[in-house]
């Protein structure tokens, strides 16, 4: 409940926006007559998927959104790559053969999120080197900007000094001519 003319703003919980986007996408795709019942069924299905696969799309989406605000959240392993949640390719192939067609599509979609880690230490080292290079570049750019400002201030000071000398000399010559 909001208070009229109040400056308070409530924060939307992480992952809630992603859940609503997913629900909205499915509503637009299916065009159901009874939207609340469809939403209830959608969320029940989502809970079942989460319990079966130990993969929470809301948590994953929150981390993806958080990437833009806090890149340190992605230094650790994402939830879909942790040891307890890896899906073996053999199990997926067996499940595809034994499951009905609709479930196979759902499983294929879920598998698309799982990737095998490939030489992550090398990538981390490259990322650290890139960050160091970027920091060095930013420091150099900052020093260059500071040097430009110092030069501009000095040139301005020098120009004002010359202008004052010229003005004083023209004033002296004008005074001599008037006398």
Swiss-Prot record:
Q: Where is the composition biased (Basic and acidic residues)?
A: 72-109, 161-170
Q: Tell me one GO biological process term.
A: binding of sperm to zona pellucida
Report residue spans for region: Disordered.
Answer: 72-138, 159-179
Concerning SMART domains, the annotation shows: IQ, RIIa
Where is it expressed, tissue-wise? Answer: Testis- and sperm-specific.
- Hey, what's the signal peptide range on this chain? none
Q: Which Pfam families match?
A: IQ (PF00612), RIIa (PF02197)
UniProt-listed PROSITE patterns: IQ
Record-annotated IQ domain positions: 143-172
The Acidic residues compositionally biased stretches are 116-135
Instruction: Keyword check for Ribonucleoprotein, yes or no.
Output: no
Record-given protein name: Sperm surface protein Sp17
Please name the taxonomic classification of the source.
Eukaryota, Metazoa, Chordata, Craniata, Vertebrata
The primary gene name is SPA17
């Amino acid at each position: 409940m909001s208070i009229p003319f109040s400056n308070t703003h409530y924060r939307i919980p992480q992952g809630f926006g992603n859940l609503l986007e997913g629900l909205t996408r499915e509503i637009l795709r299916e065009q159901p007559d009874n939207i609340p019942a469809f939403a209830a069924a959608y969320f029940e299905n989502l809970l079942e998927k989460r319990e079966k696969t130990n993969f929470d799309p809301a948590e994953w989406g929150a981390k993806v959104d958080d990437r833009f605000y806090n890149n340190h959240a992605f230094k650790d392993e994402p939830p879909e790559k942790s040891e307890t949640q890896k899906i073996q390719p053999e199990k997926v192939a067996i499940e595809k053969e034994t499951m009905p067609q609709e479930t196979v599509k759902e499983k294929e979609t879920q598998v698309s999120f799982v990737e095998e880690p490939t030489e992550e230490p090398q990538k981390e080292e490259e990322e650290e080197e890139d960050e160091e290079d970027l920091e060095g570049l930013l420091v150099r750019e900052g020093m260059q900007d500071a040097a430009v400002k110092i030069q501009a201030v000095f040139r301005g000071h020098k120009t004002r000094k010359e202008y004052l000398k010229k003005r004083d000399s023209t004033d002296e010559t004008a005074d001599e001519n008037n006398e």
